[in-house]
Amino acid sequence: MDNDYLIKKPPLQALFLFSLPMIIGNLFQQTYTMVDSAIVGRYVSEQALAAVGASYALTNIFICVAIGGGIGASVIVSRYFGAKEYGRMKTAVFTALLSFLGISLVLGVAGLFLGNQIMIWLNTPQDCLDMAAQYLRIYFLGLPFLFMYNVLSAMFNALGKSRIPLYFLIFSSVFNVVLDIIMVTKMDMGVAGVAWATLIAQGISAVLSFAVLIKNLNGLEGKQKTLFDTMELSEMTRIAIPSILQQSTVSIGMMLVQSVVNGFGSEALAGFSAAMRIESICVVPMSAIGNAVSSYTAQNIGAQQKDRVVQGLHAASKMVIICAAVICFFLEVFNRGMIGLFIGNEGTAVALSTGIGYLTFMGWFFCFIGFKMAVDGLLRGAGDMKMFTVANLVNLGIRVIIAITCAPRFGIAMVWCAVPVGWFANWAISYAEYRTGKWKTM
């Protein structure tokens, strides 16, 4: 397939072909994190599942920083690629890699010192606090690998080669699951085994991805003037910061909301954590569609084909509707079996009812996050970041305020009632900005 199919093929076909490898790859990524939780929940204890879940909200913020930063950098790289300015594109790629390597090292060191205290601030139940802190310490050691893998994947996506990260992710996922089984069920390492398995698998994937990216860049004409350009970094930062906010909105909100859930005890936290793992899989196709729209928009603007951008959003909306219908069916019909994968027959009634209640309610509202991510992807790809950022902050604010003010009084169900309200508000603001047409002049 030609690398420039995003600017040549019909919009629906182009978006489908581009997003499909990302969907498959992200499903593998989420599947092995789900396996992490399922293994500790079934083979260690319900408290171990709660510990990994308590850590998940914080660790997912770092994942979102890496993904959001990669998306911001990929917009610039996509524009240069669409305009066939390969020399500037290579400079942008290396600037992104060096920048995020430095950021990951700083965050990793900070996390080693502050991770345990953050778990305390988040009101983590005492019976799983030590395990959560142990998991975090190992996780922060592998933060550079996490950042580099996600940024490298974004670079491949910007070049229209979204299949390459998929191949490495499949390898990493399978290897991670094998290590999980060995370290937890055979070596009895508990939550530490899960953390080490993730670190090793991501490290290997990052190194291999870097080697293949260099080979692909060497095959393109044009030579970069320097390995690091502050002007390119400035432009990437302008787009990356709102992208990071957008990617982190869910996770920051989840972390703050989880502090409320933690107050209901480790049993409720275990059920909530299981539901979060399943929700993360359900969000994958919506996120991939949004990321595909972002690269599609950036390349078509770079190729002076803005009329195709509008067609692309319409095509993405059709994809969202289909995905949302499938997700709703599975969550409404199979919610009990899904939660049972993590908790098993020995799980407490509180854990089971919490997880099932969340999935049953949320199944009806995934169209909101899909529409939100599609229009957000267009604005991000066009560089229209102001209202994009406002919309995502409103989303975060609504979710946190409703959960913190209403859950203690009306029960834990208010935690998930707040989620679709935030999604809808985010979409409404972003769509209104899209309708103004300002994105065409960015």
Enumerate the language-model features and the residues they cover.
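Short runs within selected transmembrane alpha-helices of multi-pass transporters and secretion channels
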Residues: 70, 139-157, 165-173, 194-207, ...
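Transmembrane alpha-helix boundary and packing residues in multipass membrane permease domains
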Residues: 22, 26, 38, 75, ...
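Short alpha-helical transmembrane segments in multi-pass integral membrane proteins
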Residues: 1-19, 77-142, 186-241, 297-364, ...
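Hydrophobic transmembrane alpha-helices of multi-pass small-molecule transporters
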Residues: 61-64, 176-180, 206-210, 281-284, ...
